[in-house]
Amino acid sequence: MKPRLIGEAYEIRFADDAILCFQHKEDAEKVLRVLPKRFEKFGLTLHPEKTRLIEFGRHAARNARKQGKKPETFDFLGFKHLCARSRKGKFTVHVKTLAKRLRRGLKAIADWSKQYRHKPVDEQQKTLNAKLRGHYQYYGRPTNYHSIRQFYRRVCRIWREWLSRRTRGQPLTWDRYSVILRQHPLLLPRITHAWVGAGSYA
């Protein structure tokens, strides 16, 4: 199929998810027409909600403004991808944690904190820091600091909530909780990946 295309084309794949990038819209439309038939030969189908054609790249923002719209975005591997500009005004791609992934991660933290709230504080700290470290290692992208900081702050609140529920009579005030955090600090958010950027029709 690729030799029949007008311009450049690329595929980004992970497991059964993939992004097809095309230099020209005509190529993208051609592949979108042919792909379902190719899949049928192998007993496969395209996901109706995930399969769509969008303009994404250095010209997308300008073209969207002409139509009074915002550039389209797409979700892939737990991130929302957005058209953006660097400090020097060049096109780049920004990512942020998908809201549903953020909620899922926080629910897992809350469920764990509830179940193990009676364990010693230092043991809870070690496990929570391991969970935070794993979150930062995956989501710690240069343009995603706001999201991982939001995750950290919510985890701090969740931990206080469940530590407070194990005390009888005297609630765990923020002042007392601040002392616990100084003695047993939670891992601060940090960027763990180098900067990358790209763009085209996707």
What are these regions (language model features)?
Residues 1-202:
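Non-catalytic terminal/accessory segments
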